[in-house]
Amino acid sequence: MKTFKQITLLLMCVSLITFTSCSNDDDGGDDGGGVAAASGTITANINGDSFTSLEMTSFANSTTGGGQTTLIMQGNTQSQAINMIINGYDGVGTYQLTDENVFRTASYIEPNVSNPTNTQTWTAPYQDSGVCGEIKITEETDSTVKGTFNFTSKNSNDDTTKNVTEGSFNLNKQ
């Protein structure tokens, strides 16, 4: 779990560096092809509050090694992030988040840039969570991946939970 938190923190730092080094260039996006998220973004409700990632810090990336594919999807704002990892990715379909398969994870993160050790992360699945959500890939092309998601996540520091609902993504692949 400590390694996972370190990897998540590293991904957040890379995203923040990317955010500060990019120019302001908005291509407008498209209608999302039936997915609520605008092109290049992740949207969701976090305990009822709206989240929409910035296009310049949102991406999907798939890597194949050892006969297995891993899909990573990430998007963040200046103060929040959502990160989803599907190990054993096999294209369009539904991937359950359950404590029986800890190789599929989703996280909601509130980074603390001035003091990274105080970054708060809520992760799904967690111990004894059972099925706590799903990631549904509805469309994949050579350049994009689209779908929906929802999950209940837990903060291992204070045992609080965050309900991430009505999630959708329309991400460009790197």
Q: Which ranges hold each PLM region?
A:
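C-terminal or internal capping secondary-structure element at the end of a domain, subdomain, or sheet
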Residues: 133-174
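Bacterial N-terminal signal peptides that target proteins for export
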Residues: 1-9
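Short, isolated positions in well-ordered beta-strands
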Residues: 51-53
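Bacterial N-terminal signal peptides
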Residues: 10-18
